[in-house]
């Protein structure tokens, strides 16, 4: 997907980027490739692949109407090089974005990136989601939590649902279907106060399959969750 094809594909969803936004995506690509030589950010560095598998894929929640042009708060867990939250932030500057990442080198990259792109209202937090999830400054404060290919849903639910306000939504982006994962995660989602709402299946313009699971927080998460760092992955709720 060339940059022009990216713009054209967004136009199909009635999204027209300004010259500034086009330049922001271009600079994003340049910095991603430049920093990827210093720290491991992505295996995808070819320009057309970045525009397809990182930029276009990241903005799917906007394309499919899950996130609209409103000043809502989004927490991105394990965003790595800023996906999916920062491409969405470029398209909808009103979004208030917070990113948690456990690797300080990635936070340094994201700090430079947001400064270079002129992105405001972006908060970068270095640490583990399990620790921040017990912090009253962040717990139950977000409208959305996004996670792109971070962990199986049974584990991801514990990382993410505690951060959501009541009626907030977890948007989990994956390449594969969620059917088996949902069966495994059903109990965890319920215990944590969530409810599976729907799964959106779609294809990238090259035909690759993608899925977004939408889980809404219906009630407060019990205080014991998330458990201490490392426990959810080692011992998922069953």
Curated annotation (Swiss-Prot):
CDD domains: AdoMet_MTases (cd02440)
Keyword Transmembrane helix tagged: no
Keyword rRNA processing: yes
Entry GO MF terms: rRNA (guanine-N7-)-methyltransferase activity
Residues noted as binding S-adenosyl-L-methionine in the record, renumbered to the chain: 78, 83, 129-130, 148
Chain residue ranges for the region called Disordered: 217-238
Keyword annotations from UniProtKB, A to Z: Cytoplasm, Methyltransferase, rRNA processing, S-adenosyl-L-methionine, Transferase
Pfam families, per the entry: GidB
Subcellular localization: Cytoplasm
E.C. number(s) listed in UniProt: 2.1.1.-
NCBIfam families assigned to the protein according to its UniProt record, in alphabetical order: rsmG_gidB (TIGR00138)
The protein, known as: Ribosomal RNA small subunit methyltransferase G
Organism per entry: Lactococcus lactis subsp. cremoris (strain MG1363)
Gene of this entry: rsmG
């Amino acid at each position: 997907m060339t940059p022009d094809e990216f713009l054209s594909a967004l136009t199909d969803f009635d999204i027209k980027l300004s010259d500034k936004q086009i330049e922001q995506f271009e600079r994003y690509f340049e910095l991603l490739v430049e920093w990827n030589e210093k720290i491991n950010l992505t295996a995808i560095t070819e320009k057309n692949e970045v525009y397809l598998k990182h930029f276009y894929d990241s903005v799917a929640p906007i394309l499919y109407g899950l996130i609209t042009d409103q000043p809502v708060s989004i927490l991105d867990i394990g965003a790595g090089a800023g996906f999916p939250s920062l491409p969405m932030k470029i398209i909808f500057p009103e979004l208030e974005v917070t990113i948690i990442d456990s690797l300080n080198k990635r936070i340094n990259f994201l700090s430079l990136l947001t400064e270079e792109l002129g992105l405001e209202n972006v908060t970068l937090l270095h640490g583990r989601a399990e620790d921040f999830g017990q912090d009253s400054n962040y717990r139950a404060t977000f409208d959305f939590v996004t996670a792109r290919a971070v962990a199986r849903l049974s584990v991801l639910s514990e990382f993410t649902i505690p951060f959501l306000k009541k009626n907030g939504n977890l948007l989990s982006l994956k390449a594969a279907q969620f059917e088996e994962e949902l069966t495994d995660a059903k109990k965890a989602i319920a215990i944590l106060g969530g409810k599976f709402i729907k799964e959106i299946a779609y294809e990238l313009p090259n035909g690759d399959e993608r899925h977004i699971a939408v889980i809404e927080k219906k009630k407060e998460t019990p205080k014991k969750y998330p458990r201490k760092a490392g426990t959810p992955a080692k011992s998922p709720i069953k």
